Every structure is written in C-alpha cells, then in structure tokens.
C-alpha cells in the first residue's frame, strides 16, 4: 500500500503540481511531507498526518517549517 501511495504522490508532483504552481505555505511542500510521513509512519498513519497537514495549508495559515514528527517506539 505504501508503494502505491508514494507512486500516486510522484505522479501528482510530476503531472499535476506544475500546472497549479507553487502554492504550499510550508516547508517541506505538502506532497513531500506526505511522502515522508508515509515512509516513516506507514500508509494509515502517514495518510492521516498528510491529511492534517493539507487542512492546515490555506491562505490564512502563517506556514513555515513543519517537519514530519519522528516515529514513536511505543506500541499502543
């Protein structure tokens, strides 16, 4: 599942993102953040973190540096 999601993100970055222009208010960009989150946290949690990030990326947001949180070693 991770591989499929990352492939979709790469497709978005190559095919769709250039048409929309650079609009992300954060560093790293939302698509890079999503890729890192999925790689570090897996498909489910990574997608959740990416969705939260995308919801924060809007014209009224200050933006800035927002890195993917490190994985926790605790099992719940």
Curated annotation (Swiss-Prot):
The keyword Membrane applies. It is found in: Cell inner membrane. It comes from the Bacteria. InterPro entries: Membr_insert_effic_factor_YidD. The keyword Glycosyltransferase does not apply. Its main location: membrane. SMART domains: Haemolytic. It is a peripheral membrane protein. Could be involved in insertion of integral membrane proteins into the membrane. Belongs to the UPF0161 family. This is Putative membrane protein insertion efficiency factor. It comes from Paraburkholderia xenovorans (strain LB400).
């Amino acid at each position: 599942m991770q591989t499929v999601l990352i492939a979709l993100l790469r497709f978005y970055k190559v095919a769709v993102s250039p048409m929309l222009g650079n609009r992300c208010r954060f560093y790293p960009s939302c698509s890079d953040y999503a890729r890192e989150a999925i790689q570090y946290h897996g498909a489910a949690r990574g997608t959740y973190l990416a969705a939260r990030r995308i919801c924060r990326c809007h014209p009224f947001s200050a933006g800035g540096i927002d890195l993917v949180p490190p994985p926790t070693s605790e099992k719940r």
